[in-house]
A protein has these predicted regions:
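Conserved beta-strand positions in the central sheet of alpha/beta enzyme cores
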Residues: 34, 49-51, 83, 126, ...
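Glycine-rich, proline-tolerant flexible connector loops at the mouths of alpha/beta enzymes
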Residues: 34-44, 86-93
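Conserved radical SAM core fold
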Residues: 55-56, 88-92, 186-190, 233
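N-terminal substrate-binding region of glycoside hydrolase catalytic domains
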Residues: 24, 28-41, 51-56
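Active-site acidic/histidine proton-transfer and metal-coordination neighborhood
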Residues: 4, 15, 19, 58-151, ...
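A generic structural signal for well-ordered alpha-helical segments
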Residues: 25, 42-45, 74, 118, ...
Length: 261
């Protein structure tokens, strides 16, 4: 099956003009770009999604409004998916770990409004279950999916730490999966860099053959977007060069997918 391979324009790409980022990624062999809010005012095609990772637990109205802005920008640019989190985002300075009912009410209430705005704009909202947030494993993600009409951005790396069965989750959520992140990890629940790390594709504990087979079984034909978060390698080996990271990752994707060399 031919797959659309995308790359999240994070890392030091966020400091570069959108046209330069897009051209660099297309030259590196990608089919599209997953933009972040760093480029929300200059979104260019081809694009797979717009990532808007606001903290809906403690961010209040400003977090919801920022997501509204992302939805409107995506709609104007012809981007069909905006990726979101519940929060709190524990990797951000000053973030506080919360798992109380007030936090859940804030996150679910914000997501309900965001879902309504997405529906009005014709943009799907992809919730990413993510470490350090309320929706971080199968059970907490399911709580959101049962309560709010949002879809799923599926990142298998986060379920490595929680021990949830990745292929089974893909089949459970099926048609609600609208975006997929290519990222690997190993470790246990805790803090990034201490208890677990995100590593190179194929070097962690994501069961890639089974994961890809599950995607085939549900008929997933959406984008697969590389999220490069092997930060130590990025800084110490690649010298903070995002183009080098993108090229390296594209080769790893080709190996995972069995693409001809």
């Amino acid at each position: 099956m031919s797959r659309e391979i995308s790359f999240i324009a994070a890392l030091d790409f966020e400091d570069r003009p959108a046209a330069e980022v897009r051209d660099s990624l297309l030259e590196a062999g990608y089919d599209s770009v997953e933009w972040t809010m760093a480029h929300v005012d200059e979104l260019l095609a081809p694009a797979s999604a717009l990532a808007c990772q606001q903290d809906l637990v403690t961010g209040g109205e400003s977090a919801v409004e920022a997501t509204f802005r992302a939805i409107d920008a995506a709609a104007e640019a012809g981007i069909g998916v905006v990726n979101v989190l519940t929060g709190p985002n524990l990797w951000e300075e000053g973030a506080v770990d919360r798992d109380d009912e007030e936090a859940w009410a804030a996150a679910l209430g914000g997501l309900e409004r965001i879902s309504e705005r997405g529906g009005q704009a014709g943009v799907e909202i992809g919730l990413e279950p993510c470490w350090g947030t309320l929706a971080h494993d199968a059970a907490t993600a399911q709580r959101v999916l049962d309560a709010v009409d949002v879809q799923v951005t599926f990142d298998p790396s986060h379920f490595v730490m929680t021990g949830d069965p990745i292929p089974e989750l893909i089949e459970r959520w099926g048609e609600r999966i609208v975006h997929f992140h290519l990222k690997d990890a190993f470790g246990r629940p805790g803090m990034d860099g201490e208890d677990f790390i995100f590593c190179m594709l194929g070097e962690g504990k994501v069961p890639w053959p089974e994961t890809l087979a599950a995607l085939d079984r549900i008929g997933y034909q959406g984008p697969m977007s590389v999220e490069f978060e092997a930060y130590r390698y990025y800084e110490q080996v690649l010298g903070g060069d995002p183009i080098a990271a993108a090229r390296l990752a594209r080769g790893q994707v080709a190996a995972l997918l069995g693409e001809p060399s």
